[in-house]
Every structure is written in structure tokens, then in C-alpha cells.
Amino acid sequence: MLHPALALVPGEPAGVGPELCVRLVQQPRQDCRLVAFADPATLQAAAAALDLPLRLLPPEALPERPGDLPIQAHCHVHPTRFGHPDPANAPAVIAALCEAASHCVHGVLHGIVTGPVHKAVINQSGIHYTGTTELLAAQAECDVVMMLANPHLRVALVTTHLPLRDVPDAITAALLERCLRIVNTAMCGDFGIATPRIAVLGLNPHAGEEGYLGREELDVVIPVLQRLRAEGMVLLGPLSADTAFLPTKLIGYDAVVAMYHDQGLPVLKHSGFEQAVNITLGLPYPRVAVDHGTALDLAGRGVADPSSLFAATALCARLAASRALLSVRS
């Protein structure tokens, strides 16, 4: 594989996703070939709003100049109005994601880069939708882990979008073990780290204080870590979350596994939100998403920061190339 071919799915058409995609293709890429799965008219409208060139090509075509973008069309029921999402267009958004994923599962494409979606709008259309991560996992019939990353830090989550009161009961030995195995496999295969060092945070303050501040560490976390260490995994912890992110500590980790959403992600976003990306570990192909929302208030104005989409695309290309190299070696 000279360059991986990646699906580019803008997400919510009324948000900033389409214009960020237009910005993305203004420079020639040496690391991948992009194929958009989107509504052509929406991308053209975004290009016009930004006064940037855009030439949509057949899906198999090779870009020749700035603004060239191969596309697999998923036309909307109603014309897009930036800043005003329309539930009638949600089926096309979901269809674009599903077809892009199918192309990757069958080896036609080698990874997916996704823009931000609007969950409420999709659900208002009558489609039950909890998130793109869950959608892709169900389609591929596999277990996945959400990891967010920036140039300074990688944080994976044992639980994701749960009310805080539900988190302790959700953290079972089976879930934690599955999460750690997926993270370890991804760090070895996708990121090329032969022996990854994975820091595992405790659930409770001070990692439970030997049971005085909660028993989850003693009853669930430590037994799982001991079992996986016996297999050769390098797992540090359970660590107290209040000191685990000190710069002097972070240099000793390749990834951090946090027990819940707001335990790990605020630190990551503080350390570099603009270049933060969302990686779905465990899929049979790399999927990297932007780590920001639809920004409806900015849509069509040309002021949205494209850094996260640029970072997501570059990382997805690297991960796809890494998987291809591993496949050749095996």
C-alpha cells in the first residue's frame, strides 16, 4: 500500500464539519487519499461560504489540484442551512457512516475520519443513536474502547457516557480486563510500541486508601492487574488520579486508562484541546474523530478551527499505514 485510502465523513451537515473538510483538501496530501461520504451540495455550499475551491470527483479518482475531493454521494432530503440542523437529513448522515464503515470492513478503504455529529437531531429523526463509536462497534460486531489523544497524552476510558452514580457498578472485572487488553493490543499494533506502559487509575480518591475510601480497587482493579501482569502486560497502578497526571509521572506512561469520563478527559483537553482527537480502539480498521462538537453557531462563517480534523486525518493515515505494514510482516 503506497498511501492508505480513508473515508472522510463530515458528520452533522448544518455544523462546521463540511467546511472543515473543505479546508482539509486545500493542500495536497502525501500520506493518504481521501474519499468523502457526504452530500455534494452541502460541501459545495461550504466551499462557497469560505470562498475556497472545491472540485468533487468520482470515488476512485485521484486528486490533481487543491480543492479536489473524491466523493461517494449521500444526498439530503432538504438543502442544508448552516446553523439549522434538519432531522430529515439525519438518515443520510447515518447512511454515510455505515457505508464508509462497510468499505473499511471489506478492505476497499483503510480507515475512517469522522466529523462531529448531533446526537439529538439524529434521535429526533426516529433513529435510535447513542454515538458513532457504538454504531461502528455494532456494525463490526466487536468490543471497542474510546481513547482520546493529543501530542502530549493518550487517555482511554473504561466507562464513557454514564451518570457518575452508575459508574462503580459498571466497572466489573470482565469490563476492565477487556478494556486493558484492547488498549494493550492497540498500543502494540497501531502505535508500534513493543511493550507499552499503561497507567491505570483507581476509581476512588487516593485509589481507595487500601479500602478505607472504597473497595473497588481491592475487589476489582487489583486482581485484574495482577492477572494481566502475569501474562506480561506492563500495568502501573491503581494510581491516585490526583497525582497521576503530573508531568514527571506522565513521562513514564504510554497511555493512561481512566475509570470514567471526567476523571481523565479534563486533563487531556487542558493539555491541548485544539489538537485532541477521539480514537476508537478495537475496530478492524482505524477510526479517528475530531474531539469537538458541531459548533452550530460557527457554521458557515469560516472561523472554525480545523486543527482537530487535520490531526485526526494525519493520525488515521499513520495508523492505517502501520496496520498495512503489520499485515505484510505477518
UniProtKB/Swiss-Prot annotation:
Q: Which domain of life is it from?
A: Bacteria
What's an example GO BP annotation here? pyridoxal phosphate biosynthetic process
Binding of substrate, residues? 133, 269, 278, 287
Give the residues the record marks as binding a divalent metal cation. 161, 206, 261
Query: Which top EC class is given?
Result: oxidoreductase
Where's it found, cell-wise? Cytoplasm
- InterPro entries cross-referenced by the UniProt entry: PdxA (IPR037510), PdxA_fam (IPR005255)
Keywords tagged on the record: Cobalt, Cytoplasm, Magnesium, Metal-binding, NAD, NADP, Oxidoreductase, Pyridoxine biosynthesis, Zinc
CC cofactor note: Binds 1 divalent metal cation per subunit. Can use ions such as Zn(2+), Mg(2+) or Co(2+).
Please list the cofactors this protein needs.
Zn(2+); Mg(2+); Co(2+)
What is this enzyme's EC? 1.1.1.262
Pathway entry: Cofactor biosynthesis; pyridoxine 5'-phosphate biosynthesis; pyridoxine 5'-phosphate from D-erythrose 4-phosphate: step 4/5
Pfam families named in the record: PdxA
Does the record carry Metal-binding as a key word?
yes
Q: Which reaction does it catalyse?
A: 4-(phosphooxy)-L-threonine + NAD(+) = 3-amino-2-oxopropyl phosphate + CO2 + NADH
**UniProt family annotation:** Belongs to the PdxA family.
Q: List other remarks.
A: The active site is located at the dimer interface.
Q: Which HAMAP family match?
A: PdxA
- Any idea what job this protein has? Catalyzes the NAD(P)-dependent oxidation of 4-(phosphooxy)-L-threonine (HTP) into 2-amino-3-oxo-4-(phosphooxy)butyric acid which spontaneously decarboxylates to form 3-amino-2-oxopropyl phosphate (AHAP).
Task: Provide the protein name.
Answer: 4-hydroxythreonine-4-phosphate dehydrogenase
